[in-house]
């Protein structure tokens, strides 16, 4: 359904005082680029949707200078607090847009259930694949789907987590289609990045828009670290009341180092690099100023390939020799588990609805995006026949790199990707050109629609799957672009989940509380605190090789 021009509130706004809100929403969605998209603030008749009425009322009276002042305040707060991401060794502030994305309580309940269902099914799948492999024996999914996945590690076979949890943290990427239905775009089960921006976006927004938080029942996000710490402690193999937990980071050159540092500080645990740990007699120890200390749980933000030079890449200087054997002996827990990538491979993604039915005996609550699998002969031929209308994605791609948008590609680009698909069909999938939803976004002094996605974060502590209310909304700031990654011009939005009015348990987020709990400034991430000499490029290169899919 083609969206009509926006009358009602918007036209009424245009008829009122020409010096105020008309200039902010007056030209909203006059471009044909977003004509088919589902706009989250306005319906097809231009009526402000219920969850956004308060935000519209706050923003409509603003003029361009007021919007700029607030946007500048957001930017300064990010810089002052050291909220950056690293791209090619350069620290950059992560753009935060001033218009939040809002999700109603009933809608969030549906999403929460769907995410929980998906995580439970993937947990069953990983336990099965590294155990009895019943799903393969029953012929539910092809055996070669697993054996051909580069993230299936035989080193992980036989490593049984003490409390049965392999996916301690999951990031489930969602989009909203032209009908307004949420769909799963991708699963992230290894080291999903971006939760630090969820928390810092909220803190910063509360400082700049305190009146909005006073009039909306926005569910809190600042207790994520406590849920993560509980999950990590619950996973410990020891019976000690206070297991030693550490966060293992590749180092200061990694794009997500800010997040590693923030989470370690909020959980009250040590942030360590591989050189801070060593193994002896299948035990893991941490070097401290008071001597060595045994480690029980490692929340590692290092890719499998770099984790243990005795098992994976022998040239890794980021990991710890002997770590896998210590995990196999049951003396340390690695979070997330080795080999989880066999559950978030983009080709494996297409079989998750089947896994839900097989393991849980339930119908999927969240649909996938329709996907064609190039490794299947008939689907590959369909892809090649329709290549000009599809989006071609490399199975191992991340950060938006390697994606070819058929309708926008040149003949040479289409010919090149067609040949790649023929040469290595296992490495490619294809999806229709999805119409992502849009949210008003500040662009050059006014508000205009821009495409968004959503990454909610789920934490599994062995007793329940808890989903952080909201998640990271990423926005494609370039007009017409569907690539939301920060490395390609994307930004973010604060994501508000509104609490049910009858709920006393879900506490409101007050601006005063946020100001009191602002974090202390981190050390300058551009300062080399690693102890490596500037000419020692190997650690820096390996850290940068692990740029998270979030970026």
UniProtKB/Swiss-Prot annotation:
One protein family per Pfam: CP_ATPgrasp_1
Compositional bias annotation for Basic and acidic residues: 12-22
Polar residues: bias regions: 1-11
Disordered as annotated region, ranges: 1-22, 523-551
Ranges of compositional bias, category Low complexity: 537-551
Leader sequence residues: none
The family this protein is said to belong to: To Synechocystis PCC 6803 sll0335 and to M.tuberculosis Rv2567.
Protein name: Uncharacterized protein Mb2434c
Native source organism of the sequence: Mycobacterium bovis (strain ATCC BAA-935 / AF2122/97)
